[in-house]
Every structure is written in C-alpha cells, then in structure tokens.
Amino acid sequence: MIEVENLYKSYGTKEIFKNQSITLDNHCIYALVGVNGIGKSTFLNAITQPYLLDKGVVKIDGIYSSEFQAKYHYAFVPDTKEMFLNLTGKEYLDFVCGLYNQRERCTDLISDYITNLKLENSLDMTIQTYSLGMKQKIYLIGALISNAQNIILDEPFNGLDPESVAVLKGILLSFRDKG
C-alpha cells in the first residue's frame, strides 16, 4: 500500500500539489491522467524520491519512503530512459535480480518476459544502443522481476508498438490478479 499524506510541491511560486493525500492498495492498477505539465511525473517522483518533496509524508507498505527498506517494496520505471546505458540487457537484468535478492526465481520470469516482449535477440547489446521501445521493455522487465508489491510506471506505453502494448497490458493484469 502506498500512502501519501499532505503532499506539497512547488516549483518557485507555482504550486503543483497542495496538501494532497491518497492511499493506493497493493496489486491494483491506478492511472494518473491529465494534460501535459500538470504534475503526473512529479507526483510519481515524489513517491519514490521523498527528498523532492517540499512537505508531506509517503509510506510504502507502512515504511516511510525515506527509509532504505522501503525500496524493497516498490519498483519504479521513470519516464526518462537513461539509466545503466553501458550495461547489456542481460547484465542489467542480472543486476536487478541481485539487487532484490531474487536470483532463483528470476530465470524463468526473465525468459517468459523476454520472449513475450520479443527482446531475446537484444540481451547482449548495450542498453545505449536500444531504441526507446526496447529500453522501455528492458526497464519494465526489471521492475516486474523485482517481486515488489508496488510497481510504479511513468508513461509505461511510451515507445511501444501496439503488439507490445497489448502484451504489457496482459502482463500487468496478470500481476494484479496474482495479488
């Protein structure tokens, strides 16, 4: 569960959020919908990076998001795809498995996701050579194999072809249903 209490964020004199509160249950799908520049990405970044908040409290599964242990309760894919560019896809996924101490369960999951999202021929390439859609897929797979109870995705379909969008929707619905 993600609990946001009295979130306040401004950029200069422009208030983005003023005393906003919301509770989001685990294994549910929520979407932030709004016009460009309204603060959707800012909201997601504030949940995962509490030092960006001007005021407010964020708890993830009862743990303050500023505490290190909270990071094991969520996985976040931001809207910018410029992380771990010098790693190959395989190295990145191995890193994520180790980070979340999930090596044993990762192999089968990775294989399924790689096949379903058609990345099997790209794992030995560095992420910097990936297209936007390929980067999106590899980071999404990283979030999904984390075994976190909360998956936070900013612009999850950005750069994906229609077939990959359909596959990802199915994967996310399956994640939700496993609860």
Q: What does each model-identified segment do?
A:
Residues 2, 17-19, 71:
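Conserved structural motif at the start of ABC-family nucleotide-binding domains
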Residues 48:
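Helix-to-loop junction immediately C-terminal to a conserved catalytic motif
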Residues 56-72:
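Conserved ABC transporter NBD signature motif
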Residues 80, 86-101:
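Q-loop/switch helix immediately C-terminal to the Walker
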Residues 94, 98, 105-122:
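Conserved ABC ATPase "signature" region
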